[in-house]
Amino acid sequence: MNKYLLDTHVLLWMQDDNIALSKAARKILEDSTTQLYLSIASLWEITIKQSLGKLQLQYSLEELIDSCNANKINILPIDFETLKILKTLPFIHRDPFDRIIIATSMELDLDLISSDEIAKKYSTSVIW
């Protein structure tokens, strides 16, 4: 079974059925045999951006979490192993949420689904 970690924007684009999703990403997301994961950092990022007025959604955070559950997207905590990897990451990427997501991908050996070009500079598999 293939296992993938979703970047924050991928979750939102999936929720909105956004045409910005690549064909490769869409194929993975539509495959019922894949196992999808999301870092709690993504929900934290969404919450902060909403509270700052930088992100407006047509649905609540609760509805987004319900959608994750309905789509069998497993929400992962930030644990000590993730923090150990995060501490050693070079500062190629300055966004703290993306750094946590990248560290989670590395820790759990999950392919990261993301359009983020900077994420590709780390030693984790990025699919787009």
Where are these regions (language model features)?
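Short, well-structured N-terminal submotif of metal-dependent ribonuclease cores
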Residues: 1-38, 54-66, 108, 117-121
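Acidic donor-binding loop at a coil-to-helix junction in glycosyltransferase catalytic cores
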Residues: 97
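Generic structural signal for small/hydrophobic residues in well-ordered secondary structure
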Residues: 8-9, 46, 86, 105
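Alpha-helix capping/helix-boundary segments
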Residues: 10, 42, 82, 101, ...
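Acidic, PIN/NYN-like endoribonuclease modules and their adjacent C-terminal/linker elements
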Residues: 100-128
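Acidic catalytic patch
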Residues: 63-91
